Amino acid sequence: MIALSRPSRRAAAVGAFTVSAALGAALLVTSPFTATAAGPGELRIHDIQGNTRVSPHVGEQVTDVAGIVTGVRAYGSRGFWIQDPRPDDDPATSEGIFVFTNAAPAVAVGDAVTVSGTVTEYYYGGAARGDTSLTQISRPTVSVVSSGNELPAPVVLDADAIPAAYAPEGDPADGGSIEKLPLQPEKYALDLYASLEGMNVRIEDAAITGPSTAYYELWVTLQPEVNATSRGGTRYASYDDPNPGRLKVESLVPVAQQPFPTANTGDTLGGATEGPLDYDEFGGYLLAARELGTVVPGGTEPETTRAQDRKELAVAAYNVENLNPSNDQAKFDRLAAGVVHHLASPDIVALEEIQDDSGPVDDGTVTADVTLTRFTDAIVAAGGPRYAWRGIDPEDGRDGGQPGGNIRNVFLFNPDRVSFTDRPGGDATTATSVVKQRGKAALTHSPGRVDPANPAWDSSRKPLAGEFSFRGTPVIVIANHFNSKGGDQSLYSRYQPPTRSSEVQRLAQAESVNAFVRDILRVQKNAQVVVLGDINDFEFSATTDALTAGGVLRSAVFSLPADERYTYIFNGNAQVLDQTLVSPGIKKFDYDIVHINSEFADQASDHDPQIIRFKP
């Protein structure tokens, strides 16, 4: 997957404000609104929120809406939350709402206030992106009635509180949208969260399923027994089962005052975490913690796979996340340690996201010899073999990824264990094909690109095919990095089920690779072919179905227990993005996903490597 960059939502808060641990003191800063004494108006928060995702009062001016301040955010989307301490009897109508001030608010937690302003529905990234909107009061005038009030009791969210069903089907008459459907919080998890939008909620002793990040956030699950991984995470098992208990957690306290904790998958966010329930641009529903629990280590450690024996060929794949010469040496060393110590120095390593020698500088450079020399030197320094490499430089700016980086697939191989069969003529635009030589399938160009002129590979990495020989037996390896999921609607989308628009291109890519493997097997029925890399799609996806169509390939991930099937964690969901597939000529194999990155806050890459061992 291609990582998306974003500014730190808390950067403005670092060292900028003085806030008590409970945010109990008023922020003494300039604000566009004034604080004066006033009484409540007739319209209540639950009236504004209504029983759907869109306020029945959107666009209207509201006057003297009363509530108790339950949280203050002085960074990012600045404002505060208020909650009516006198709820109605409708569980579908939230009693809380966010007041967007666009400046550090001059209110404190526990203040009783009245707010006048405009009711708006804010769509992060714009309405066209498909996300659910956040109901808020904008351009406010705020009056403080009293201070030091008791907060409304939090709604406790636990395993029993979360419905098993994730979301309703969208309304066909509304383009598949759910935003105008009446909320059913007792039936659907997304409806439950929507019905609590802006309200004070509490979780206790929550299992951490997504490690803390540079953006001061982590993911927990309120249902740790649902789709549990073997190492304390939550596995994305199917499109119909996206794990409704997942919740993102951030802190409202600036990190300069209270550093955000470091957490790994398998840890626990111990004690109570409490604050308003928000909707986040980068991950759905979010507990904006006024009170943050303590991380209790779970003891998760990076895995190590076994070494191959003398007669086994070990082939690995590793997405090294935009590796380039501008990276510090520590990244090269950590990735090298992963290859040597955690993967036990495989015979062949298919690398994804090797950048060119100028990295993200867009200067026309396409060679990657400097990048690969530094990496292979680091492997030797870590005690590994002196790997040789093969690859094909891409056309400048034609293969997607980070602008200027020209990422590509590359083979490393240990010449003391395996030989590479070089057949010249392969370049960025020339397709390799299959011929018969001495009764065996052979590539016309090795290394060579698979079907590079096919529009399926536009702005995407072209597959790299190479022919190897191990103990006299030829093996064809195809390294892949399919297009990313960028542009897909999120699991929290107001369109349910969400549209996976990026899948169209991956399907075409899978069909292209499948057709190439068919060509190999037509020439040699028992040819030994390994297709591997960052497929950017799940084991239950249509992409995997297209790769394996006709029985020409089978995905090795299914040889693992279900609770071990993941190479990447996104929004707290452990999932398969990287796969290894083999042709029928490889009858027995030993496959492993080596969890050394995805579960940890301190990562060498955002993907876990995978390895397959077999006897050709």
Residue spans for each PLM region:
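Extended non-catalytic accessory segments flanking core domains
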Residues: 38-318, 322-345, 429-433, 438-462, ...
